[in-house]
A protein has these predicted regions:
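N-terminal Rossmann-like dinucleotide/flavin-binding domain of flavoprotein oxidoreductases
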Residues: 89-96, 109, 129, 192-240, ...
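Glycine-rich FAD pyrophosphate-binding loop
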Residues: 177-193, 320-330
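Glycine-rich dinucleotide-binding loop and its adjacent helix/turn
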Residues: 132-150, 208-228, 251-315, 437-451
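A conserved FAD-binding loop/helix module that cradles the flavin
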Residues: 305-308, 461-489
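N-terminal Rossmann-like FAD-binding beta1-loop-alpha1 element of flavoenzymes
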Residues: 155-180, 304-315
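Ferredoxin-type iron-sulfur electron-transfer modules in oxidoreductases and energy-metabolism complexes
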Residues: 25-40, 64-65, 69-104, 108, ...
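FAD-site-proximal beta/loop scaffold in flavoenzymes
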Residues: 260-293, 392-465
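Feature captures the FAD/FMN-dependent oxidoreductase FAD-binding
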Residues: 150, 155-159, 207-256, 371-394, ...
């Protein structure tokens, strides 16, 4: 453990942020991290809690409690406290090969399950400790290419380069298999590259990691739309195993009048256009969907909706409203949501903080949905009719659904982004490989194996939309199954 009395001696201290009105002037990361010395003090707060739920990764109430990767959190907290940064990095990478990603975008399931947080009211700064470890590793030159000492002679094609694709590629390459990753976009990274804005995950962080993987022998092929322009049968015939890691990219849409109005977009298309234009030309090409000078309506209150808020503010939108279908969560845990369950409480993310600073309001309007999009004679979006909702319980099934109250209001807007989640993987890749899907629209599997010989599946394409950390866990577990299939056993 770290310092015996650390959780009593020190209070929680986290990184500060660039002020909201200053940071929305650009798309840069905005956290001002603690010094290594300050981070060592924070690591000292990790207590000898007996049952470290922070690393449990168990499902409670349908949600994860603790880290899905089962990171050895108490171990590397102790090592950080002692100043043994290189050893802390080694212990961290035992379970997580991509801490530079999770330390930036993970919602810190570990901290929500932290015993210190339950005892003192403030958890250990696990995510920021992780960030300090990995960035110290890069700064000191400890993170560099380490190709496998021998090759097995087996080849694996991985379709998709998002979190699960990168994870399965990493582990199979460590094992010595020849790994080729096919990505349909022009850059590697999938969700990490185009689904998460640059201010949340700077794309140089992804590129830095990809260069190491390439130096270790992983081959990346971009602009390769397998199942589309690239024949799936050719891939099947050319590799000893194939892993489908194409995500759950079929977005949930709104089937309401006026959906065809010019100015209504799926959120993922919006975020992709902005990041691509930023990387290609620093917005000089004018190809990004642009919220400048426009009122923006965002439908959906999850991470993607929040990212749309932050992006629209940086572009210079004139107003912002975000619709949330469900009731506003409580500020404190309810009696039926005890620790160490994930806390179902009201959270204020960076997008809401920035909107409050810019417009003096939280953009979220709870228990609402779009009834109709309004448009002018040219088909341009001019507004939306928004219905208020109320929960209603079905006496026969016991299920609760949100139904209209009959009360409505109209919001004048010129852009609307639908961030209502995803309903499964896209059809064409699954159909091209002939793999079966389940009722939820995900590829059906038996221990990551599909119904087609030598074709595996992992990540959101298998489990449905989830977190980056779950994608990394899926890739790690799937790699072991692929290795077992190829070699008859696995040491992953």
């Amino acid at each position: 453990m770290a310092k015996l009395t650390g959780f009593m001696d020190y209070t929680r201290k986290t990184s500060t942020d660039v002020p909201p009105l200053e940071r929305i002037e650009n798309f840069n990361e905005f956290h001002i991290w603690l010094s290594r010395e300050e981070q060592q003090t924070q690591a000292a707060r990790c207590m000898d809690c007996g049952v470290p739920f922070c690393q449990a990764g168990m499902m409670i109430g349908g949600m994860a409690s603790g880290c899905p990767l089962n990171n050895l959190i108490p171990e590397w907290n102790d090592l950080v406290y002692q100043g043994k940064w290189e050893l802390a990095l080694r212990r961290l990478r035992t379970t997580n090969r991509f801490p530079e990603f999770t330390s930036r975008v993970c919602p810190a399931l570990c901290e929500a399950a932290c015993t210190c947080g339950d005892v003192t009211g403030s958890s250990v700064t696990v995510r920021e400790n992780e960030h300090a470890i990995v960035e110290t590793g890069y700064a000191k030159g400890w993170l560099h290419a380490a190709p496998p000492p021998a090759r097995t002679g087996k080849s694996v094609a991985i379709i998709g380069s998002g979190p699960s694709g990168l994870s399965v590629a990493e582990y199979l390459n460590i094992r010595g298999h020849a790994v080729t990753v096919f990505e349909r976009a022009d850059r590697v990274g999938g969700l990490l590259m185009y689904g998460i804005p640059n201010m949340k995950l700077d794309k140089s962080v992804i590129e830095r990691r990809i260069k190491i993987m390439q130096a270790e022998g992983v081959e990346f092929r971009t602009n390769m739309d397998v199942g589309g322009a690239v024949d799936a049968a050719e891939i099947l015939n050319s590799y000893d195993a194939i892993v489908l890691c194409c995500g759950a990219k079929k977005a949930r849409d709104l089937n309401v009048p006026g959906r065809d109005a010019k100015g209504v977009y799926l959120a993922v298309d919006y975020l992709t256009s902005v990041t691509r234009s930023l990387l290609d030309s620093k917005f000089a090409d004018g190809r990004a969907i642009n919220a400048a000078g426009r009122n923006v309506l965002i439908i959906g209150g999850g991470d993607t909706g929040n990212d749309c808020q932050g992006t629209a503010l940086r572009q210079g939108c004139t107003d912002l409203v975000a619709l949330e279908m469900m009731p506003q969560p409580p500020k404190e845990r309810a009696a039926n949501n005890p620790w160490p369950e994930w806390p179902k409480v009201l959270k204020v993310d960076y997008g809401q903080t920035e909107c409050l600073a810019k417009f003096g309001k939280d953009p979220r309007v709870y228990q609402t949905t779009v009834k109709e999009f309004l448009k002018d004679d040219a088909g341009n979006l001019t507004g939306a009719v928004i219905s208020y909702l109320k929960p209603q319980r079905d006496p026969d099934t016991g299920r609760t659904s949100m139904v209209p109250t009959g009360e409505e209001f109209t919001y004048d807007c010129q852009l609307a982004f639908i961030a209502a989640g995803f309903v499964g993987c896209e059809d064409y890749v699954a159909e091209a490989f002939g793999v079966e899907r389940n009722a939820r629209g995900n590829v059906a599997d038996h221990g990551f194996r599909t119904n087609v010989d030598k074709v595996f599946v992992c990540g959101d394409m298998r489990r449905g939309q989830s977190l980056v950390v779950w994608g990394l866990r899926e890739g790690r577990d799937c790699a072991a199954e692929v290795d077992r299939y190829l070699m008859g056993y696995t040491n992953l």
